[in-house]
A protein has these predicted regions:
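Active-site-adjacent loops and short helices of periplasmic peptidoglycan-processing enzymes
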Residues: 22-194, 198-204, 216-219
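Domain-terminus/edge residues, biased toward the C-terminal soluble/receptor-binding domains
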Residues: 170-174, 182-404
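Bacterial N-terminal signal peptides that target proteins for export
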Residues: 1-11
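Structural motif marking the loop-to-transmembrane transition
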Residues: 3-4, 71, 127, 386, ...
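N-terminal signal peptide c-region/cleavage motif recognized by signal peptidases
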Residues: 14-20
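Sterically constrained small-residue positions within well-ordered secondary structures
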Residues: 12, 40-42, 62, 255, ...
Length: 404
């Protein structure tokens, strides 16, 4: 009710604004066994690499994360993402029959130097089979056929790829084709590729599950998944290999152990030995994943149902508004460090109505040893309508007085 607040404010002719920055308790911050953390194992020969926590996108370790690289067939993760998004929108179905055009056959078929699903020219293949061929065997012909089926041409499909990439947050990426063969306008970064892998797992888990299939048979030809980590570690369930002479040997990987999932990417390993290239990209990723699981832990600190602050609302029908995070807010830290966390909230001096439910009002910042390690927007849990004319007028006067 505004009337009691009006009386209290009238008595003092002044209102104390909610603090611009306040400390708040950090839940789920009980200490765990502290361990001495060695440096992350840099993958041998890699020009860029990165390890990311899946739940929050935090980078745990990396080198040259924003250096421009050729993604090679890791590109096909974005092709898969577009396929899944278009399927979710009801524009295509797994049962669709897709024509293998001359463009798909010549650009990615058995007569090319790239990886292929050996799809016969002029044949009709189900969309589901094409997706398997692209994800498991890395078939360039399958990628082109999918692109043509969805958008009518590779060029139009690439526009979709770049549109979705920007939505994911891949700000330093540009795709020029759906398969990843070298092109001057086809590039990405380790950070962007990790974000892409994270988005694929998060947004389309059913489509992502294709990445852990070890082999399949099409046209009488048994084809194996090129991600050798699927055989080396049962916690690994994806995601995509890549290789061209310019890109080197590359691998974007993910593993889940318990409730923790990590995403790793190793790029740009140059060697004339295919076996060595395979081994280096696999062992480099596996070492990063093992290091991350051993020395880091991830905890959810706040959930949307937890009210973190209730600042005063000016010019509103309600005196206060409950603030919370919009989505579960987790933090990844070295083991044993959670008890040292500090949480602060940044709010404007005056929170002014009207406020919509879900509207950002402030920011929650989590710090360790004086350094901000994670932050999230604080949003209004409920809407707050404007007060009456006289209520707004009175609060306007009090805000003026408070600013003197």
């Amino acid at each position: 009710m505004r009337f009691p607040r009006f009386l209290a404010a009238s008595a003092t002719l002044c209102a104390v604004a909610f603090a611009a920055a306040q400390s708040v308790p950090v839940p789920n911050a009980a200490p765990s066994n502290s361990v001495q953390i060695p440096a992350a194992p840099a993958p041998a020969g890699a020009s860029a690499w990165l390890l990311m926590d899946f739940s929050n996108g935090q980078i745990l370790a990396g080198a040259n994360p924003d250096a421009r690289v050729e993604p090679a067939s890791i590109t096909k993760v974005m092709t898969s993402y577009v396929v899944a998004a278009e399927m979710k929108a009801g524009k295509i179905k797994r049962t669709d029959q897709v024509l293998i055009s001359e463009n798909a056959w010549r650009g990615g078929g058995g007569g090319t130097d790239g990886s292929t699903s050996f799809l016969p020219l002029g044949s009709m293949v189900s969309l589901d089979e094409l997706e398997r061929g692209m994800v498991i065997q890395s078939g360039n012909d399958a990628a082109i056929a999918l692109a043509e089926h969805i958008a009518g041409s590779e060029t139009a499909f690439v526009e979709l790829m770049n549109t979705y990439a920007k939505k994911i947050g891949m700000n330093n990426t540009n795709f020029a084709n759906p398969h990843g063969l070298s092109d001057p306008n086809h590039y990405s970064t380790a950070r962007d590729l990790a974000l892409m892998g994270r988005a694929m797992i998060r947004d389309f888990p059913e489509a992502y599950a294709y990445n852990k299939i070890k082999e399949y048979t099409v046209n009488g030809i048994r084809q194996h998944n090129r991600n050798g980590l699927l055989w080396k570690d049962t916690s690994v369930d994806g995601i995509k290999t890549g290789h061209t002479s310019a890109a080197g040997y590359c691998l974007l990987a993910s593993a889940k152990r318990g409730e923790q999932r990590l995403v790793s990417v190793v790029l740009g390993i140059q060697t004339d030995s295919q076996k060595q290239g395979f081994d280096l990209r696999e062992n480099g990723n596996l070492a990063l994943l093992n290091w991350g699981f051993r020395f880091y832990e991830t905890r959810t600190l706040y959930t949307p149902d937890k009210v973190i602050a209730s600042p005063r609302v000016w010019k509103g029908k309600d005196n206060t508004v409950a603030l919370a995070v919009a989505t579960p807010f987790s933090v990844s830290l070295p083991r044993g460090k959670f008890d040292a966390l500090k949480a602060n909230i940044d709010l404007p001096k005056h929170v002014i109505a009207p406020l919509a439910a879900g509207q950002k009002v402030g920011t929650l910042k989590i710090s360790l040893d004086g350094k901000v390690v994670a932050e999230a927007p604080l949003v209004a849990k409920v809407a707050v309508a404007e007060a009456s004319f006289f209520g707004r007028l009175w609060d306007g006067f009090l805000m003026w007085w408070d600013n003197l």
